[in-house]
């Protein structure tokens, strides 16, 4: 078999990967490919460690978090390994270095006083959007889980809320066509399916 570019391999990889992952996961992969990998490496037949290291440092200098850059490299490695498996390219593991963070950001959380203020405001100025925020603040549900709730998930007599789905807006890129879609899915992990006391 002949060599292929990373762009050509990514097309075949997407077709291969699609049946095995959720639509939202595939949309995230495509977004990473289109926005980061293909503009930088799409026409390459192979990738050397130094080119990838320079790419990593450039992305971080331009404001991406280390985690976001690592996510990009995960997708890049999947494409590269798929290319090797099909004998379209050579690939050797890279030893990529990430700059250590100069300052660790402290996680900002809502104070108890502000939590109470928000709940009181929602109670005094009812709206359905406010109700969603209220449920989230009182139960710890993620916003996608709150938006995916149905009346059948709420058991008033038992005082529980059953969580077994989430809703998210995903960005779809299909050739030149780009749009967003709302997708209802199961939560990311099995432990996310749960029953919560009200």
List the predicted regions and their residue ranges.
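Short aromatic/basic micro-patch
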Residues: 46, 109, 195-197
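Conserved hydrophobic/aromatic pocket- or pore-lining residues that grip, position, or stack substrates
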Residues: 37, 52, 76, 97, ...
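C-terminal catalytic core of Y-nucleophile DNA break-rejoin enzymes
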Residues: 162, 171-174, 181-198
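Short, structural beta-strand-to-alpha-helix junction motif
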Residues: 4-9, 44-46, 150
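Secondary-structure transition/turn motif
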Residues: 57-61, 162-169
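Basic, Lys/Arg- and aromatic-enriched nucleic-acid-binding interface segment
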Residues: 66, 70, 85-143, 147-149, ...
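N-terminal alpha-helical segment
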Residues: 9-10, 48-52, 114, 128-129
């Amino acid at each position: 078999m002949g060599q292929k570019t990373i762009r050509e391999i990514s097309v075949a990889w997407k077709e291969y990967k699609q049946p095995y992952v959720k639509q939202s996961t595939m949309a995230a992969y495509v977004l990473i490919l289109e926005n980061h990998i293909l503009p930088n490496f799409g026409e390459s037949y192979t990738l050397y460690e130094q080119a990838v290291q320079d790419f990593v440092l450039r992305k971080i200098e331009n404001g991406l978090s280390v985690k976001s850059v690592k996510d990009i490299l995960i997708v890049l490695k999947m494409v590269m390994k798929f290319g090797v498996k099909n004998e379209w390219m050579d690939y050797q593991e890279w030893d990529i270095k990430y700059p250590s963070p100069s300052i660790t950001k402290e996680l900002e959380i809502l104070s108890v006083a502000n939590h109470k203020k928000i709940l009181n405001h929602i109670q005094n100025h009812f709206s359905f959007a406010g109700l969603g925020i209220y449920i989230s603040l009182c139960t710890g549900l993620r916003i996608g889980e709150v938006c995916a709730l149905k009346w059948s998930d709420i058991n008033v007599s038992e005082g529980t809320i059953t969580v077994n789905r989430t809703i998210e807006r995903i960005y779809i890129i299909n050739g030149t066509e780009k749009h967003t879609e709302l997708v209802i899915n199961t939560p990311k992990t099995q432990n996310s399916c749960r029953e919560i006391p009200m």
